[in-house]
Amino acid sequence: MAFIELYQATGKHKYEISAREIFTYVLRDITDDRGGFYCAEDADSEGMEGKFYLWTEKEIHNVLTQDEADLFLSYYKHRSDTSMQGMQEIPDGYFIPHLNPSSIDDAEDGLTGFFCKMEGIRKKLFAVREKRVRPHKDDKILTDWNGLMIAA
């Protein structure tokens, strides 16, 4: 709810995008067939924290055309730092793509243009990522947590 309220208060698209992406993830990956929301998804798979979400530039270029890869890498920062407390070090050459909000603010066609350009690119990357070993899902459905999701 925090990102929704931040967007409503500031009108900054980076908060809107964050909220949209969270809801997309939740509805796609941690929602029960009957509509309940699962508790969580683990961070690690195959013995490495975050492995499911890590990419290399080579992987990006192997999946996308040159123009698509250049566009994706211009919008998404290469975040290879381990700023989250307790997170394992990310192996050399791997990174977690993090949207650079200023790249959207600077885009000529704004937020709508960004989503149009990224839709096909993200689908291609998602299809490849879905072939990886997924982290374990905690499929408990807790009433209080579900109430918060419904409120959001």
Model region roles, listed by residue range:
Residues M1-A152:
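Glycan-recognition and catalytic cores of secretory/periplasmic carbohydrate-active enzymes
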